[in-house]
Structures are given as C-alpha cells and as structure tokens.
Swiss-Prot record:
The chain crosses the membrane at residues 292-312, 545-565, 598-618, 626-646. Part of the tripartite efflux system PvdRT-OpmQ, which is composed of an inner membrane component with both ATPase and permease domains, PvdT, a periplasmic membrane fusion protein, PvdR, and an outer membrane component, OpmQ. This is Pyoverdine export ATP-binding/permease protein PvdT. Its EC number is 7.6.2.-. ATP binds at residues 48-55. The keyword DNA-binding does not apply. PROSITE patterns: ABC_TRANSPORTER_1, ABC_TRANSPORTER_2, MACB. Part of the tripartite efflux system PvdRT-OpmQ required for the secretion into the extracellular milieu of the siderophore pyoverdine (PVD), which is involved in iron acquisition. This subunit binds PVD and drives its secretion by hydrolyzing ATP. The system is responsible for export of newly synthesized PVD after the final steps of biosynthesis have taken place in the periplasm. Its main location: membrane. The keyword Transmembrane helix applies.
Amino acid sequence: MENATQPVPLIELRDIRKRYGGNGTPEVEVLKGVSLSIHAGEFVAIVGASGSGKSTLMNILGCLDRPSSGSYHFAGHDVAELDSDEQAWLRREAFGFVFQGYHLIPSASAQENVEMPAIYAGIPASERHTRARALLERLGLAERTANRPHQLSGGQQQRVSIARALMNGGHIILADEPTGALDSHSGAEVMALLDELASQGHVVILITHDRDVAARAKRIIEVRDGEIVSDSANDERPAHPSAGVERHLQADDLSQRLAEGSSEPSGAWRAELLEAVRAAWRVMWINRFRTALTLLGIIIGVASVVVMLAVGEGSKRQVMAQMGAFGSNIIYLSGYSPNPRAPMGIVSSDDVAAIATLPQVKKVMPVNGGELVVRYGNIDYHAYVGGNNTDFPEILNWPVAEGSYFTERDEDAATTVAVIGYKVRKKLFGSANPIGRYILIENVPFQVIGVLAEKGSSSGDKDADNRIAIPYSAASIRLFGTRNPEYVIIAAADAQRVHQAERAIDQLMLRLHRGQRDYELTNNAAMIQAEAKTQNTLSLMLGSIAAISLLVGGIGVMNIMLMTVRERTREIGIRMATGARQGDILRQFLTEAAMLSVVGGLAGIALALCIGGVLLLGQVAVAFSLSAIVGAFSCALVTGLVFGFMPARKAAQLDPVAALASQ
C-alpha cells in the first residue's frame, strides 16, 4: 500500500548498458547494467573516479547520448521511443546543463548565451531579455551581460552556465564537475548556488570525483567501473517535495507537457531565424578576411552575370533602335541569288520601273554605291558614296540637318552635288560650315549642299553616318559607269503588310526574269527579327559564361560552410544541449549560407552598376534590366542555399555528445 502512494520517479533507469567500439575495433563496455530512480526534489551526487562511467551516465540522463541496451523512462515515457525533436524538448524544457568546461559560445555575449534555450523555446524577445538579465543579476553578473566568455573569469563563466541552465526553468540541473576547473573560492560559490537551487525545489544531479563536493548532496551514488556500488537513496530521499516542486516537477505534469509541447513552439521560428541571422553576421564579422575571400567568388559571379547581360541587352537595344530607325516597312532587293551556286543576277532599271507600278509599293529607290576615297583640301577619307534618288529622306526617315537635299532637277541633269553624313562632316570640316564647299570623290568635284542628321550605325558592319548621298544619275555616269543599281530599297505602302508586298515583288521579278530566282529579297522587319535572335543568343552565351563564375562562387560557399561546421562543432553541441532541434541547426547553417549569398549578391550588384557606369563613360551600350538583376541575385541565393545544404545537413546530423567533446 505504501508503494501505491509512492510518487512516480522523474527518472528511472533499468539495466542501462553503454558500449563503444565494434565493427572491427575492440568493444568496450562503459556502463554495466546501471539501475536507479530519481524523484522530484532530490539533490543527488554521482561520484566516481575518472573513467568510472559517471560522465557517460550523465550524458544518457540528459538525452545527449543513447544507451546500448536497457530502459530509460522519463516522467513515465520511454526515452527510446522519443524522436530527436522530443529529446530536444527534454533538453530544452526539463534539463539544464552545467559543464566543467562551461561550454559557452565564444562569439556570443553572456546575455546571449543565457538566452539561447529561450530562443529555441519560442519565448518573445522582450521576455527573454528581461529573464536573462534577472538571472545574471541574481548570480552577481549584472555588469557583465555584454561581456564575451573570454572577458570573464572561470567562476563568472560557470555562473553564466548556471544562468543558462535556469533560463527555461531548469527543473533538473545536470552539473558535470562544476567546480573542476575553478579555484576553491569560485568553486565554493558555485556549490552554494547549487545548494540554493536544490533548496528551491530543483532536482540537482551533481557529477563529481570529489567526495567533499559530493557530500553537499542529500543522496550519493557511487559508480565504479561502470557499475553502481553504493546508493544512499533509501535514507536520504525527501518524503515531501516543496510547493514549488509540486507545481513544477511532478512526473505526471512533465509527462503531460512532453506530450503536448515537443513540437516547435508557436512563433519560435521567428526568434530562431533572427538569432540565426545575428549569429551568422557575428561569424562573418569575426572571420571577415576569410568571409571576404568567399564573398569574392559570389561578387564576381553576380557582377559578371549582370554586366554581361546588360552589355548584351544594351547592344541589342542599340542595334534594334538603329535598324528600326530606317523603317520597318523597308524591303531590299539585290542581284545576289539565295542559291550560292547560281550565277549573280542583275537588277535593271526596267525592274525598278516595274516595281514602282505595284499597288503594294509606296516608293522605290535604286542605289548605286560603294566605298570611295573622298578628299577635302589635304584630307583624304574613306566613306560610303551612294547614288540615290530624291526619295532618300522619306524612305529611310533620314532628314537633312543642314542645307537641303538635291532635287529632281539635279537628278535629271546628273548634277554633281552631295549631301554628306554627320561623321563625314566632322572628319572633313570639323566645326566649319560645309555648305557650298567642294569635295573630290574619286577626283570628281562635288558641291556640298546639305548635311544629313546623325543616324548612327545600322548593323555594326557599316557606319550609316559615314556616307555621302549624291544623285543616282551622277553616281551612275561619273563614278560607277552603269545605270543598273547595286541594290534597290523599296518602301511598302502598308507597314502591316510588308510580307504581302514582298510576295508581290517576288512574283513580278520571277515573271520579269523568266522564272529564274537570280535575286534576293529581304525586309527590314525580318532583318530586325533575325538580329534580335542573334543578339538574344549572344546574351545567353555571355550570361552562361558568367554563370560559371557564379557556380564557382557557390562551391566557395560550400567549402567555407564545411570548414565552419568543422570549426564550430562544439558550438553545435552546445546548441543541441540547450534544446536545439536538428531542424534548428539546419536552419542556422542554411541562414549563414544565405547570408553569405545575400551579402555577396548585393555587393555583386553594386559592383555591376559601377562597372556599367564606367562602360557608359566609354561609350559602350549598357542596359541594366530589373529582371536580370533580380535573376542574378536569386541565382546567387539559390546557389548558396544549394551548396550550403550539405554542410548544414552535416551539422544537423551531428551527435550531441560527440560534438560537445570536439576540440
């Protein structure tokens, strides 16, 4: 009957064994059939020499390690049946660890170290800060909240460790050699704190090799060679826990909370994400030289993609604008056969006259031209000289900026007059007025009567402004010796029906040339489409080349993250000991990879804009597009996350006790 009223133990071990080795290595059994029960309100000391198995027993009690065999029940739950998140809940909500080596995160302040369990518990920031400051003040560290571990003495670090253990309540304090690394005065202070916690109703499990320290406990369990050799439990166990213990530490209460609260607390992910961002920034800043080298790959990759695409888009827009400036209703006819094996045809003046009669045609302009030497004074200059009719300004949408264009009378009389392009004017006359001056074209004098408006390059192979327009008749008689045009420019009557006009011209030419297709027809719209396709292909190629450097940057992220995981293995163990789930660790390191990518991406965009500005000063066509910038940044972020996932997953899968033991 007495047993029926006995409270259910918080912790109950039955025949716990722990073995290491196997798989080709010698097997060592560290714990050999350990059985014990611990109730609410107990202050227990587990004492034993070094290597006796007491620390291994503590790791199993705190769910940092799993036994090889036997059963461990916590608050009536079989711990072996709990998944990793449920065991993390126990470490976060039920246990508080005080380690011999303090196990504080070096890059975090005292307050940030204390707050860590509360972050994983999803406690709001304001409440978290208040509670952490209150605990540190209670432990005499009110003036040390912003100090990092290396700025604290050993005793102060251990008090920070105790404050951290109490952050989420610290119902069960697991203290592993808490005085082992301290001087006698600091050790006495720590033991006084543990006595105080025990008197307040916390379960305190003290792991020590010092029998004088163990004597402070109400119950002493001696472990030797992995076995319990003595246990004072029968006489020393308190019969009635305090009111605080009744409220917080009864097994059935913790059992219910475990069943309800092992999932991620509401809102915890926000706190954890903010903490992950802050931690990532701290690590990046502390290792800023290494971070800068890693970021360099991402920066170069993003900048390359953005600049390459901007140059490609700028070139495309420039070419499209310049080609479109000549009109989208333009059709070109030449004597070049589309069949390279066929003989070259001749487009005659009769063909031109016949085309002009078609209803689908608005204007027809034969062109007889070529690259010739032009002289003014002692300046010789090569320019394209084209014999055209008076429809030139209208067909090509190319007005005269200075002077006038030649007339039908000039055409009929084969008058030697010339309208020069903007570039020719600059080269031959500089700032002087060219109107009325004479130039020599192939030693034939022509009087300049006008200057064409600046037009720009047509397609990159000829400079449209580097040309001279003269009457077609004068060009045929004085310069080229033939009335047959080099090619014909035709303006369709309707810009929306250019293809119909092209078909009508094709049918007419086939009839005039007796079914022989010894000519070639192209229209400006088709040329623009073809050029656009070419430019798109070029942009894609440039972007692909640049993307390779972005890929290299991603590999750099993976490399640095793998190195970070190796260097911060103990920190990962500390986070797990304070209640971090595997998902929390994964989120932490993925956030760091994302931070690297975000900072590198933003810096890459800034560098790209600077390079673009320099290129614009150098008269290079550059057109930044929001889609290219967002795309490059997104690719950098995705690349960082993809390459950061493997290191993050490796970190999340670390064994807590092995991580804590790493150097």
